[in-house]
């Protein structure tokens, strides 16, 4: 059963909003780490982001056009926020050297080529590069769905398993390609749900069973959840635990968001989640010590950081949209030939 890929689904924006808030909470840490009991949040947080991105997949007008579009949507924002975050850190270090414990070196710009080292000046930005690779991987195999669907699924599982065991063997591929491989099954599941399942339909007779499905998902997660380190492709559990717990968490959040449908502020954050993803790291880098200076209770500190950071992101979002929309995946910097056979009303603005 194939859905209408041109129709916008409100609760997908809400899901993206919940996802980006969970990501910000994870980077704040502190008291929020206590919420991640038995890895019940971390087991699905980043897989959910890959899953949602798969929902937006469109093949467009060929491989070259697809790559150019993904450069516009992912690589240009990656480069902009990667370079601007470093320059911000470098300028502040030049003005006030005492702000950072160690000197800021131009060599830090090469960190993205050093395996899976932490990008200290903007840690979350790795996801955009990984998602770009994931898009390309799926583009190369998605044509099989027309006549060789079992083969497409088999290749998806093979690529996912290969990425997972590369992590277990501590073999790192450049530019997060191994992580993209591990994440591919989540991305493909999002694509499949979007096009061939009633799950995303606005209403269905099974919707009344959502509370039951959510409870079942929680039970599955309780018995299978393990810690995921997707940035480093490092997983404490076995392959069954990792994928089963992640999918249980994904469907739990999706079902809850389908029930709620829309929350204005959270849905807004979700619709333009690429902005919050790209700027909350530098904000926390400077805001964290300031908040810690005046607030000493762990929970008050974490909540204050979350509210202030999200407020700054919400305030800056319309500025980015108006001033530099090309840098936040809202307009194309590199022009591509339009294919009018594709419906652009639900384009993949991650």
Language-model features, listed with the residues they occupy:
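Alpha-helical transmembrane segments and their immediate juxtamembrane cytosolic regions
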Residues: 1-350
């Amino acid at each position: 059963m194939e859905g209408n890929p041109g129709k916008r689904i409100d609760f997908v924006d809400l899901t993206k909003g919940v996802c980006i808030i969970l990501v910000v909470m994870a980077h704040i840490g502190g008291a929020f780490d206590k919420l991640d009991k038995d890895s019940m949040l971390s087991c699905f947080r980043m897989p959910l982001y890959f899953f949602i991105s798969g929902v937006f997949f469109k093949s467009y007008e060929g491989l070259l056009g697809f790559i150019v579009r993904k450069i516009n949507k992912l690589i240009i924002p990656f480069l902009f926020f990667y370079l601007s975050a470093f320059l911000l850190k470098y300028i502040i270090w030049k003005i006030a050297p005492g702000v950072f414990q160690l000197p800021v070196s131009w060599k830090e710009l090469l960190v993205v080529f050093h395996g899976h080292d932490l990008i200290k000046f903007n840690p979350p930005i790795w996801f955009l590069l990984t998602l770009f690779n994931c898009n390309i991987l799926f583009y190369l195999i998605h044509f099989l769905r027309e006549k060789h669907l079992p083969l497409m699924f088999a290749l998806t599982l093979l690529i996912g398993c290969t990425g997972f065991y590369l992590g277990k063997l501590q073999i790192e591929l450049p530019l997060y390609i191994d992580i993209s491989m591990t994440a591919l099954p989540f991305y493909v599941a999002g694509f499949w749900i979007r096009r061939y399942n009633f799950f995303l339909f606005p209403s269905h007779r099974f919707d009344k069973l959502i509370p039951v499905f959510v409870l079942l998902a929680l039970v599955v997660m309780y018995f299978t959840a393990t810690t995921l380190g997707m940035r480093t492709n490092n997983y404490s559990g076995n392959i069954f635990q990792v994928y089963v717990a992640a999918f249980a968490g994904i469907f739990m959040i999706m079902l809850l968001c389908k029930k709620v449908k829309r929350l204005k502020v959270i849905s807004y954050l979700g619709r333009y989640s690429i902005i919050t993803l790209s700027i909350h790291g530098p904000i926390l880098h400077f805001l964290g010590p300031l908040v810690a200076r005046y607030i000493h209770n762990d929970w008050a500190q974490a909540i204050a950081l979350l509210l202030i950071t999200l407020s700054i992101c919400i305030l800056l979002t319309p500025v980015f949209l108006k001033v530099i929309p090309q840098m936040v995946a809202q307009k194309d910097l590199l022009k591509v030939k339009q294919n009018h056979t594709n419906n652009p009303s639900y384009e993949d603005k991650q």
